[in-house]
Amino acid sequence: MIKLILSIILIICFIINSIESFKMITLTTGPPSDLGWNNMINLGRIGVTKAMDIEDSRLFVVSGRNDTYELLLPIIQNDDIDLVICSSLDHGDACKEIAAMYVNSTEIKTQFLVRGSGATTKNLIQFTYNYASVNYLSGMFAGLQTKTNKIGFISPGITAGASDCFVYAFWLGAKSVNPNIKFYYYNIGSYLDKDKTKGAAENLIDVYDCDVIGDTLDDFTASNVAISRGRYAIGTNGFPQRDVYGENVVYTYAYNWTKYFVPIASAVKNKIPPSKWYADFNKDNNLSLYDLSFGFQVSAETKFKIINQTKSFASYVRTLHPYFCNEYMEGYTQKYNLTRQPNTTNCITTTGFIGIDAPVGDMNYLGNYTIKFSKVEFQRSIQIGFSIVSGLLIGFVILMMIGIVKYQDTPSIRSASPSFLNLTLLGGVIIFIGIIVWVAPISTHQCNARFWLVTIGFSTLIGSLVVKNIRIWLIFDNPELKIRTITNNQLYPWVGLCLVINIVLMSIITTVGDLKAIEAQGIDSLGKFEYMTICKMNYTGAATLYSILAYFGTLLLVGVFVSWKIRIVHIEEFSECTAIAKTLYSISFCLFVIVPLMISPQDKQSETIILCVTGIFITTGALLIFFLPKFWRIFGNEKQGSHEHFTQRKQSAVASARAESANRNNSSNSFGFSKSSAQIGNTISGIESLNDDSNESSLSNETK
């Protein structure tokens, strides 16, 4: 007996396992969270899954023929799917193509449910629903509810494969109950484009004063805009919006796809041949596709008119509905060559109705809504701020240049070479001008000018400081204190070389580097429809720019090294090396701080601010460190026109030590000569004339 029971159980299990489970796929164009078409399709999927106890019910979000085809074909070939619900017109072409591939297949048993009223095949089911009737009703509600008598509408349009026949049905419904309405509508080219929908809805409200807006889109974006602007929101995308938004939505219709998906899926499971399915209002509410809902503030009269019209639609054939037969159709069908129903002059056929695309009657078509890209400008206040600061600093530097000329005969200025001092200040002026240009409105010329000015300015400033320091090093850094006459004319070519290197590298950036202004999107925190004008260069230009930075780095390293070498000079007027060293150290330190900031992610405005602040700080700091001590000595210590180091024969401790060492070494050289401390003092006191070419010969005679 036990063996018999076990055998029966095994047979039952075998039979159960041998029964193939029903597998279903549902395709939507958007996520179920859209509170619209896709959500209702998904609810229909869930309803049929529960009703038929389907274990394998999949949902895929996909749109477009190519993407749908690539997604669906491998699944059909490998997963033994029973039913594919292609919910959108977007899926139709791909689903029909795959169905045609396997129409006579003995292995692929998949049935495809597609939207349309075309012919069915062995594996192709057609379903359609009367979308015009519910749009006519929604239009009636809008016409009864509007206070401004201005109604707006948004539709995908012909570019999305949808004619505006349903827009016309909405308008006609509003016109039937309120002849005084003005009707405005946009196409947006898609069933689901939140940005365009939002922009079009805002335009209808702000520009055309529409207080009711309808749509034939997949989501609730248009009504969300209406709610945010304090207008009536109506749900015209098939989702029961009042369940979510409550009394902010005064009217909705909702699809109930479960009523149709269950019998269709059951027919597929029971291997009933495919057929056409049609959904609309029905005398039997259990077979009606649409469920209507009204807000509390909607009058009983309005509700009565709407509900009464639904009963009217269910009582006679669709081809006699008012959106098929009316006073506008005779002239419209003639004008646009659309077919009329036989033996009538004012009734359009279903095919002709689908072909309605141009405005009917006094409909106002506003065209395809396009989003205008907005340009994000650099903050004007920041531009003005940097320009004012740089302008004031230019004025300050010019005053220093005038002071250099006025006090050029004082020891502090004469010993430092007035022409080189002004050349250094000129570099600062060029940098400040470059910063003003840097924050100016961007263009290709501005992109090039700002790099040229800033780099030339830094080459002039840093080059002059480094070359001056090298001269001091060559003069003082010799144990025997031999006279070395190095004139300004001998130094200018070296500063010129610094500029030539800069000019050559910048020329490469300007020409080969393709430095230009471009309009960029998707950078920084720009919105989807915002753009910014930025400067852009190619790989060669970027590599050359790094070469310029390396060149400046090398120049700074040379300057720092020379400053360290001449740290022994303690004569105040000639110890420019101290000021120059401090300047170069400060610049180097700033660069070590700034470079990591620039490498880290920065938006363009922050990057510009960092660069400009750095440029102003480095340049101003360098000039103040270098020039303030000179003017301080002029006004504080040189009342007699000379400093004590110039009036007293006194040398530095290091110089004295070197002189004594030189005396000891030279005393054993019969062909040499020795220098007394007084002679060394004479040498140092005469150095001030090195910057005055006319005094060089007298200086040499004095020190020989």
Swiss-Prot record:
- Where is this gene product found? Membrane
Q: Which GO terms describe its cellular component?
A: plasma membrane
State the membrane topology: Multi-pass membrane protein
Q: What are the recorded Gene Ontology BP terms?
A: G protein-coupled receptor signaling pathway
Q: Which domain of life is it from?
A: Eukaryota
Keyword field contains Transport: no
Entry annotated with the keyword Transmembrane helix: yes
> Sorted alphabetically, which Pfam families does this protein's record hold?
7tm_3 (PF00003), Bmp (PF02608)
Kindly list every residue the record annotates as glycosylated: 66, 104, 256, 286, 308, 337, 343, 368, 538
Q: Which residues form the signal peptide?
A: 1-21
Write one Gene Ontology MF term: G protein-coupled receptor activity
Record topology, Extracellular segments: 22-383, 441-455, 514-541, 600-608
Which stretches of this protein does UniProt put in the Cytoplasmic compartment? Answer: 405-419, 477-492, 563-578, 630-704
Q: Which InterPro entries match?
A: GPCR_3_C, mGluR/GABA-B-like, PnrA-like
**Positions of transmembrane segments:** 384-404, 420-440, 456-476, 493-513, 542-562, 579-599, 609-629
Residue segments, region Disordered = 657-677, 685-704
Swiss-Prot/TrEMBL keywords: G-protein coupled receptor, Glycoprotein, Membrane, Receptor, Signal, Transducer, Transmembrane, Transmembrane helix
Q: Which protein family is it in? A: In the N-terminal section; belongs to the BMP lipoprotein family. In the C-terminal section; belongs to the G-protein coupled receptor 3 family. GABA-B receptor subfamily.
The protein here is known as Metabotropic glutamate receptor-like protein K
Gene that encodes it: grlK
